[in-house]
Amino acid sequence: MKIFEALEHERSWSEEERLLLDQVDRLTAEIIAPNAARIDEAGAFPWDNVEAINRLGLNAIFVPEAYGGAPMSFRLYLAVVRRIAEACASTGIIYATNFHAMKPLIEFGSEEQKTRLLPRIAEGGLAALAITEESAGSDATGMKTRFQPDGDEIVIDGAKIFITNGDVADRILLFGKHAGIDDPRQAISVLVVEKGAPGLETLGLEKKMGHRGSSTAALRFDGCRVPAANLIGRPGDGLAILLASLNRSRPSIAAHAIGIATAAFKDMTAYMNERKQSGRRIIDFQANQFMLADLATDLAMAELWLDHLAGRIDAGAQDFGIEASMAKMRASDIANRIVTEAVQMHGGYGYCSDFRVERLMRDAKITQIWEGTNQVHRQLIGRSFATK
């Protein structure tokens, strides 16, 4: 792992950032990682991990100070996601989803909305981002959830699926179509639904291949009433807000995938240094060394690209959608390659739950699917080269 230790050492962190990362490292080593196998086996929401994250104030690092936060750089946030995901992928995505759901409110919400809704998240509340429906996955314009104005309220009817944190969230950022707008793209709007809103119901939780400690809910909105003041922006602003928010959440998913990949790479190389066949360590076979060289190089390139992208975002860049797609696609692809080889290098042991690589392989797959499938990202990247 010398090359990755060197990359980490070369990252320039302020004293405050380094102090926080040291605290995160202790948190993951002492609390989050030791809980990971139990959480996965039980399929239990990791409340202890969430409470530990809250004690450290990690939600506050992406919330502006005016609303109870203690903001730090996007690059630092990604480093935190990477560390938590390396220790426990379920906890990593629970934490990252808070950012995914609240960033649109931070960027596009009114002063009144941010003052009213953000402090709960900064102090440790949970958030969810509700976009996907049975008929609307990669194509968000197919969503059928409807927002009907009624005086000083908006009445919501519809359903969402695959919503991370959906059953436990204090705030749900919900996308739907505003009544009275015929164009399916221009009708998309977004509002905040608060926990306990009348007409909001959790229909059930998915039983998943991986990320078993992270709850994935199906939600129904049956005449659900929320204040009209919870609408972010104007009716019809939702698609622009959605696309802008995805450009921020995709680097977050890349960091999450890199965390999983790092855990698998560490376990694989440690095992290969110990395991012997035909009197030799399996790491001493040339074919295995070639495989490690390819994986290590690709993982390092994914990390460096993500660092580059985070630097652009921290510098105020606004147009980085293609770079974000590249980061998410490449990081999730290399994560799946690494976990596959890690299981292979462990032989039969890798297929057994006594070894972490079994869980990591299950956890890695979804990173190629959520926040836009990698097929969609390849299309977005390739299409960007077409002349108009």
What is the predicted function of each stretch?
Residues 1-87, 91, 108-111, 124, ...:
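Alpha-helical interface subdomain recognition
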Residues 57, 81-85, 193-198, 222-225:
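Short Ser/Thr-interspersed hydrophobic loop/turn segments at strand-loop and sheet-helix junctions
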Residues 89-112, 137-140, 148, 153:
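N-terminal glycine-rich flavin-associated loop
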Residues 123-132:
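A short, Trp-centered hydrophobic/proline-enriched beta-strand micro-motif
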Residues 135-138, 162-165, 181-182, 208-215:
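Short Gly/Pro-enriched turn/cap motifs at secondary-structure boundaries
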Residues 142-144, 196-227:
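Flexible, small-/acidic-enriched active-site or ligand-binding loops
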Residues 153, 157-202:
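A short core secondary-structure module
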Residues 217-244:
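A short, charged helix-loop
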